[in-house]
A protein has these predicted regions:
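Short, non-transmembrane amphipathic alpha-helical segments
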Residues: 22-37, 69-97
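N-terminal presequence-like segments and adjacent domain-start helices
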Residues: 1-31
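Generic structural hydrophobic/aromatic packing signal, biased to beta-strands
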Residues: 1, 26, 47-49, 85, ...
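Short edge beta-strands and adjacent turn/loop segments
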Residues: 3, 39-64
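General structural signal for secondary-structure boundaries
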Residues: 38, 65, 108-110
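Short, charged/polar micro-motifs that form catalytic or ligand-binding hotspots
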Residues: 16-20, 49, 75
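Short, low-complexity, polybasic intrinsically disordered segments
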Residues: 62, 67-80, 114-127
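Polar/charged, Gly/Pro-rich intrinsically disordered segments
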Residues: 95-127
Length: 127
């Protein structure tokens, strides 16, 4: 049997606070990111954020088709999207509260449907 000490309990509570705070920032960021993408004619189909206990965050952006993804890669839209996301995270205070350790991945829903039978959880696991 394991005994959880008060020190361990305190660490767990602090970690939970960080996780909730990190999610609060990300919930503010996502609509802004979507708005930016619409305004710049590079519509994001789906976005997933995977926070890592205040240490970093993975942001996975999906476009609808492989064709869109390839066009955006070739036309520098992917780099502009990364820059816009970082600007949004800075504007809302995320970077100041946590840090700028953000890992990006880009894919298409078409690929998720084809390779993962539409299961985004399996797709995200492959990153």
């Amino acid at each position: 049997m394991y005994i959880i000490t008060q020190e361990m309990e305190n660490e767990i509570q602090e970690m939970d606070k960080k996780n909730f705070k990190q999610w609060d920032y990300l919930k503010k960021a996502i609509p802004r990111i979507i708005h930016w993408s619409k305004k710049n004619n590079c519509r994001i189909y789906r976005i997933h954020c995977i926070p890592h206990s205040g240490i970093s965050v993975d942001i996975c952006i999906f476009y609808k088709t492989d064709k869109e993804l390839n066009i955006y890669k070739e036309s520098n839209i992917i780099d502009l999207t990364k820059e816009a996301v970082m600007n949004i995270l800075t504007e809302i205070g995320y970077v100041e509260e946590f840090n700028d350790k953000v890992r990006f991945s880009f894919d298409s829903d078409e690929n998720v449907q084809r390779k993962y039978l539409g299961n985004y959880g399996l797709r995200l696991h492959d990153d």
